[in-house]
Amino acid sequence: MKIKTRFAPSPTGYLHVGGARTALYSWLFSRHLGGEFVLRIEDTDLERSTQEAIDAIMDGMNWLNLDWDEGPYFQTKRFDRYNAVIDQMLDAGTAYRCYCSKERLEALREAQMANGEKPRYDGHCRDSQCTHGADEPSVVRFRNPQEGSVIFDDKIRGPIEFSNQELDDLIIRRTDGSPTYNFCVVIDDWDMEITHVIRGEDHINNTPRQINILKALGAPVPEYAHVSMILGDDGKKLSKRHGAVGVMQYRDDGYLPEALLNYLVRLGWSHGDQEIFSIEEMTQLFTLDAVSKSASAFNTEKLQWLNHHYINSLPPEQVAVHLSWHVEQLGIDTRNGPELVEIVKLLGERCKTLKEMAESCRYFYEEFDAFDVDAAKKHLRPVARQPLEAVKVKLAAITEWTTENVHNAIQGTADELGVGMGKVGMPLRVAVTGVGQSPGMDVTVHAIGQARTLARIDKALAFISEREAQQ
């Protein structure tokens, strides 16, 4: 049997982390077993579905490198197919027209709730012989079995049973002629030959209804696996107030797709005590029986830890491609400065995100307007004039601009003055970067370049002179 899974988001908002994890699990399951992965856009909610949301879903999937073998399919383009099946069901008696007014249904609901009953349709039109005008508005309902149970073996949770008496007759076509979500899903899974439906636990209650429709159509029933929800650190369902945002916001905030994928796969799935997984390892190891039934709590610090790991473990050339986007967003012109690969090597250990790295690399490419106040107050004092003037002479004398020669110039200055490296290095750091923290001075000065370094030392010396004049 060819394994076939699907990811079927509704385009009513961005692709959030819960949806991305579901997509990842479905993708991994199919890839692990050599199957196919389908992308389907469930856009039957015409009022809430937007092109912007569709674009956000596609962008998120592409950024995460979760490729699909079929699709994207759009439910709104398949209405003729859905309605054709509904008409067949009406002819076969597995569906019927319901003419109950909104007022009657609302009164029924209120009465049931007043009696402590679960609100459900009472089957008023199910076996009715009453006649109605051809133009009288009606919905179409599925004739759900009234006896027995629906039992399915959830591949994460085990056997789940629903009594058919608890299920009312589901509306499958609205008065405006549009098919409903639960029905469209069934026909899509049937037509697309989906073998395994992996989705969030909020769909568990939809499953028995969908199984009954499939059986009424004589269609094969796929396997189902329902993934537990993601919680915030306060134990409540993850939402915007926890910082939960769309997948592309994580891109904007400087996270690598490899880090987010690694984090999401571990948010409910495990393989021993292993924390770090490449996409190849995930594909090789992923199974549904290792997915937890319990909810998982989202931990931003853990994601940052993973991101820092991948910034420093992936090939610098690969990280630099992602960094270039962030640098462009800040309007930094990198043509007059080191290659971004060098920035990744220099700043990787110091930065948890690429956004932080982009913001920290400005001094390699741009002149700064002012020195950091605290750093200048501490290190650009009159006592720093001598080491700055001395190191400038040695740096200016370098004919081959290498990291080693830069290091020797700084070390040689300290040795000649009989002071520690910090007495030379710290004023030099503030002079050439404008801030009090940076990578080692030899690699930093080398990357900034000889001419720019000398000019910045002159600027720092002028700053010291102005400071002396004001005292």
From Swiss-Prot:
ATP binds at K240. InterPro entries: aa-tRNA-synth_I_cd-bd, aa-tRNA-synth_I_codon-bd_sub2, aa-tRNA-synth_I_CS, aa_tRNA-synth_I_cd-bd_sf, Glu-tRNA-ligase_bac/mito, Glu/Gln-tRNA-synth, Glu/Gln-tRNA-synth_Ib_cat-dom, GluQ/Sye. The keyword Ribosomal protein does not apply. Belongs to the class-I aminoacyl-tRNA synthetase family. Glutamate--tRNA ligase type 1 subfamily. Its EC number is 6.1.1.17. This is Glutamate--tRNA ligase. It is an enzyme of class 6 (ligase). One of its GO terms (biological process) is glutamyl-tRNA aminoacylation. A motif ('HIGH' region) lies at residues 9-19. Catalyzes the attachment of glutamate to tRNA(Glu) in a two-step reaction: glutamate is first activated by ATP to form Glu-AMP and then transferred to the acceptor end of tRNA(Glu). Its cofactor is Zn(2+). Binds 1 zinc ion per subunit. Zn(2+) binds at C98, C100, C125, D127. A motif ('KMSKS' region) lies at residues 237-241. Its main location: cytoplasm. GO terms for molecular function: ATP binding; glutamate-tRNA ligase activity; tRNA binding; zinc ion binding. Keywords: Aminoacyl-tRNA synthetase, ATP-binding, Cytoplasm, Ligase, Metal-binding, Nucleotide-binding, Protein biosynthesis, Zinc. GO terms for cellular component: cytosol. It holds the Pfam family tRNA-synt_1c. It comes from the Bacteria. It catalyses: tRNA(Glu) + L-glutamate + ATP = L-glutamyl-tRNA(Glu) + AMP + diphosphate. It is found in: Cytoplasm. Monomer.
